[in-house]
Amino acid sequence: MELQTLQEALKVEIQVHQKLVAQMKQDPQNADLKKQLHELQAKITALSEKQKRVVEQLRKNLIVKQEQPDKFQIQPLPQSENKLQTAQQQPLQQLQQQQQYHHHHAQQSAAASPNLTASQKTVTTASMITTKTLPLVLKAATATMPASVVGQRPTIAMVTAINSQKAVLSTDVQNTPVNLQTSSKVTGPGAEAVQIVAKNTVTLVQATPPQPIKVPQFIPPPRLTPRPNFLPQVRPKPVAQNNIPIAPAPPPMLAAPQLIQRPVMLTKFTPTTLPTSQNSIHPVRVVNGQTATIAKTFPMAQLTSIVIATPGTRLAGPQTVQLSKPSLEKQTVKSHTETDEKQTESRTITPPAAPKPKREENPQKLAFMVSLGLVTHDHLEEIQSKRQERKRRTTANPVYSGAVFEPERKKSAVTYLNSTMHPGTRKRGRPPKYNAVLGFGALTPTSPQSSHPDSPENEKTETTFTFPAPVQPVSLPSPTSTDGDIHEDFCSVCRKSGQLLMCDTCSRVYHLDCLDPPLKTIPKGMWICPRCQDQMLKKEEAIPWPGTLAIVHSYIAYKAAKEEEKQKLLKWSSDLKQEREQLEQKVKQLSNSISKCMEMKNTILARQKEMHSSLEKVKQLIRLIHGIDLSKPVDSEATVGAISNGPDCTPPANAATSTPAPSPSSQSCTANCNQGEETK
């Protein structure tokens, strides 16, 4: 059949996936293995989608068969055992389809078995969100399996809760096929139907005319947080002891054959009435993860506990797993992991005892502590568990979480700025997986938390997977080593891993040799990559820096603004200097022109003085001539004739001989007569 071939192909791909997972544990930094792992996960997802379509087709066929009146009998699929064996390692889509398919059977058989005895075990569970199922996959091994079969894949029991129904459950767990009959009797509003599918085949019989079936659709919760770096794997191994006490339940009506699997009991109580020793579940301490005690807590003040004990052939310790829902819309998983290398003794489950209530704190004391900034021990544990909060992937099986093998994230820039150590002591490369300094987390009590809800002021119930180690306390992962880290895993230049230098302002990392220019030593203090430096200089986009980085970058922006203003002032100063030089040159030119003008003025004034002196001489000459004319009128004619004749005139011989004295004056007068006329 097509479904069987798909399951075989899925089985082969899952085996290859497990081999790759083992190789990734040896070499978690290998990029090729990561690529192969992602491709293999894509193949598995595609196969699961095909199987989903096949299951939907089978469901349609069942609906068609249901429409036939009078006789209707559901035949078990021959591949049910194979599906149950491979369900643990298939993705969440396959688990959802199988759960819907089995719930389809359960609703059909619900109307066929209304006559159940009162001695059979009744199960009630608290209401959950409409159209949301919570798959819980647990491994169980039988006590009669031979030693050669112990290593094979164990049986899987699936617990499915569907809204708006409440059923009475009757199970007989045997080595033979399990007959599972449920009644549609409604015992209370808001309750839910619970179905348990065990190993081998499931036979469901319906004799009355069927009713239309409503199949709930699963809506995966939105991913509000990034993928976790580590998810614990719930794999309880078989244990040898078969005398594990469990909270008592009404005895079954049928003759009890030898039990292959221990009975499954679900109890419900509210925090107002604390459980007694008969219906309470003692929390089991974890050594190396064997028997699982799973407590599921709801914030509606109701608690549903599921206890499953799995006997086996080997001696091992118990294991405690606690699940809760912090809100009605999202589920978070917080993991505390502590390794245990030496197991000195195997622990067994003690008889059930009532869990201790949380210590009552005085409200005035709490208010005083809050005003001082102090916290109580319970609040401290809550804060430390919140620091390790991780978002679980949509796959219910943690084996398929691809985030398990992602590389360790590096410290964020806020860590370096908030740290009190010297900035030069920052080391290159990836920080260690576990912090060397023991924090408060290592000093918390290793005993598991009580199985009842918190006090009313702490209505937020937390989801924890607790694996405490009893021998040696190993420090918890540093809360700052992975929380809020945004850095990449590979060098931004060569895209390879190794010892990387992280930028304190962005998510990029670099090798020292890949930088331009390359660095020889680790820079002290805050280091900014070249891209961030260019970005801050260009101011292409504003980056909202968180926390202390906002102060740093505001100072950087202030310095950049001051530097820019300084550059502007320097440029202005240089422009002014250049303009001054030009003005000085103009001043020199003007001074030269002024000096030339002054020289010309001086020359003109000198010539003017000379002309004035010459005029004075002419005037004196004229006066002399007038004086000669008055004294000697005879000679005046000759003098006037000499003046009128100019330089070419020659006095007569008698005049020259008779008046020799005025002859030089007449000569000077004739020499300057023309110049005097010009000046006049």
Swiss-Prot record:
Subcellular localization, as worded in the UniProt entry: Nucleus
Record location of the Glycyl lysine isopeptide (Lys-Gly) (interchain with G-Cter in SUMO2) cross-link: K65
DNA-binding region boundaries: 425-437
PROSITE patterns: ZF_PHD_1, ZF_PHD_2
Keyword set includes Transferase: no
ZnF PHD-type: positions: 488-535
GO biological process annotation, one example: chromatin organization
Disease cited in the entry: Intellectual developmental disorder with behavioral abnormalities and craniofacial dysmorphism with or without seizures: An autosomal dominant neurodevelopmental disorder characterized by impaired intellectual development, developmental delay of varying severity, impaired motor skills and language delay. Additional clinical features include macrocephaly, obesity, overgrowth, craniofacial dysmorphism, epilepsy, and variable behavioral manifestations including autism and attention deficit-hyperactivity disorder.
UniProt protein name: PHD finger protein 21A
